[in-house]
């Protein structure tokens, strides 16, 4: 869980901004969205394999 403590004389807006940044970096919201619906293991594997293929194609394009 993202834990943000207020610093000296820090406004609520800046603390909220730090909290939102930390939540984004930790991937908490994307994880929660992913877990809202059940995904069958074969579907999960397909999605991950497709992502790996996309990354490999992108790396190959960048290398040339």
UniProtKB/Swiss-Prot annotation:
GO terms for cellular component: ribonucleoprotein complex; ribosome. Keywords: Ribonucleoprotein, Ribosomal protein. The keyword Cell cycle does not apply. Gene3D superfamilies: Ribosomal protein S8. The keyword RNA-binding does not apply. GO terms for biological process: translation. Residues 43-64 have a biased composition (Basic residues). InterPro entries: Ribosomal_bS21 (IPR001911), Ribosomal_bS21_sf (IPR038380). Residues 26-64 are annotated as: Disordered. GO terms for molecular function: structural constituent of ribosome. It comes from the Bacteria. Belongs to the bacterial ribosomal protein bS21 family. NCBIfam families: S21p (TIGR00030). This is Small ribosomal subunit protein bS21. It comes from Dehalococcoides mccartyi (strain ATCC BAA-2100 / JCM 16839 / KCTC 5957 / BAV1).
């Amino acid at each position: 869980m993202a834990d943000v403590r207020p610093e000296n004389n820090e406004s609520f807006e800046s603390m909220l901004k730090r909290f939102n940044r930390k939540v984004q970096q930790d991937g908490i919201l994307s994880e929660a969205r992913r877990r809202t619906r059940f995904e069958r293991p074969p579907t999960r594997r397909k999605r991950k394999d497709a992502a790996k293929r996309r990354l490999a194609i992108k790396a190959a394009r960048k290398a040339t």
